[in-house]
Curated annotation (Swiss-Prot):
Protein's name in the database: CTP synthase
Region span, Amidoligase domain: 1-270
Organism for this UniProt entry: Polaromonas naphthalenivorans (strain CJ2)
Reaction(s) the record says it catalyses: UTP + L-glutamine + ATP + H2O = CTP + L-glutamate + ADP + phosphate + 2 H(+); L-glutamine + H2O = L-glutamate + NH4(+); UTP + NH4(+) + ATP = CTP + ADP + phosphate + 2 H(+)
Residues binding L-glutamine: 356, 384-387, 407, 473
Activity regulation summary: Allosterically activated by GTP, when glutamine is the substrate; GTP has no effect on the reaction when ammonia is the substrate. The allosteric effector GTP functions by stabilizing the protein conformation that binds the tetrahedral intermediate(s) formed during glutamine hydrolysis. Inhibited by the product CTP, via allosteric rather than competitive inhibition.
EC annotation from Swiss-Prot or TrEMBL: 6.3.4.2
EC class: ligase
Pathway this chain belongs to: Pyrimidine metabolism; CTP biosynthesis via de novo pathway; CTP from UDP: step 2/2
Binding, CTP: 13, 151-153, 191-196, 227
Any one Gene Ontology cellular component term annotated for this protein: cytosol
An example Gene Ontology biological process: pyrimidine nucleobase biosynthetic process
Known function: Catalyzes the ATP-dependent amination of UTP to CTP with either L-glutamine or ammonia as the source of nitrogen. Regulates intracellular CTP levels through interactions with the four ribonucleotide triphosphates.
Residue ranges of every copy of the Glutamine amidotransferase type-1 domain listed in the record: 295-547
Amino acid sequence: MTKFVFVTGGVVSSLGKGIASGALAAILESRGLKVTLIKLDPYINVDPGTMSPLQHGEVFVTDDGAETDLDLGHYERFIETRMRKANNFTTGQIYQSVLDKERRGDYLGKTVQVIPHITNEIQDFIKRGARYDTPDAVDVAIVEIGGTVGDIESLPFLEAVRQMSLRMGPNNSAFVHLSYVPWIAAAGELKTKPTQHTAKQLREIGIQADVLLCRADRPIPTEERDKISLFSNVPAWGVISMWDVDTIYKVPRMLHEQGLDGLICDKLRLHTPPANLKRWDDLVYATEHPQTEVSIAMVGKYVDLSDSYKSLNEALRHAGMKNHAKVVITYVDSETLTPDTVSSLAQFDGILVPGGFGVRGVEGKICAARFARENKIPYLGICLGMQVATIEFARHVAGLKDANSTEFDPLTPHPVIALITEWKDADGTIKTRHAKSDLGGTMRLGAQSSDVSPNSLAHSIYGDVVTERHRHRYEANVNYLDTLRKSGLVISALTQREHLTEIVELPQDVHPWFVGVQFHPEFKSTPWDGHPLFNAYIAATLEQRSALSQAKKAETAKPLKVVAST
């Protein structure tokens, strides 16, 4: 039977519940347990698909096409289990499901209430995510509850897991509570009072924490931990310090050395081999001992919040580790780039243009793509980054003046990027949409396969077939592909079903490394293997850096021209 660990947070949000949950899952997985993670989000949105990245961070996409919280990206980077739609749900989904049942008459005329109908539905969703009572059920499901204790929005979720724990019995569930222990510079000490209060709030709704993870900017001394233990009713060995580190991949070792996994296994009566964290130690060593460095300009429109590109940042760092290089990412606001300012990108070893929506900042991205093409700087365009590269090529190489996407200019004379109105989803279901369709859930989503052209750069990276995750509405217009091909653009991958453009590139005798992809490869990158596309991209930037360095040395070594004096 599946055991459950419920992870809650207090005092403030953004403490790192997702990192803590993923790290705990990684340690338990290293003990030989089958683990999954589930994220409960208390907002009323059905999913984060229509939320601003500047407010919510990136939207992480699963293989089965779910638009989910960015924490699911952390989960996939910490453990082997792949996430599904069932691993993330929101208040909006819960209420939508309950109201659908009410309309069908499933409640047989009863008054539908938060307790028991909403709380029961939450429990059913949790069990579904854990595959509870099924042949492929996991050993441990770690359930992260978004928000903080005391928020009105979180109360139904907290009540649901309280009931669930009561029904399952004390040895089948555990509660881990994250709290903030601030350092007050003026007083020169850590303050434990906020943690005492949040533990009390948790008890007031019927939940006693088994473990307190105390977040701070430094390790918390024993004296403060003993004080927290006394006032929170948690044994001293259950008060664990979780301090700031320079890489999240140090967190599993940090928590293991303080005995967190042992505490959880004892509470849940799980008998397992000791944890083996060698792979994490090796990973941290690789992170801390790069042999070289490479600089990447990420030209985006959501650069004010780095979490908007969380998986992309991690994918670049993973590729850096595979190439024994430190990747230094500089965020460039695409709205600041014009033909007069784009030369500022010359200082970087590579240019990357990520995905995005809407017309704001698009011309700056087009400038970046042109600068990379004309100056032979390694370029990787993802989703919108592929589309702007196609638009730029159409305008300045193929001679299609004012070429554009109908997303940005519905009246463009050359819509080289346009809205596709019918396609098959990841599960084969035929979907339709038009310009006035709802924004939520109307994109091409999830994993889909494409055939890769032989003798292409893409083929050297992926082989014959590429399967990647998608999240977009607009596609390269098939009516312009022949024109673009004749002008020198290589269409190196097409979807197997609709033959839509998936990868474009420039021949390597024209440009050393120029690739645009319609999908989102960053969602499948892992710290162990990186991702073949990002690995190749960073390798190309390193080659470019080395070639420029050698050319500069050769230029410096030239003998001085002697001018005869008169």
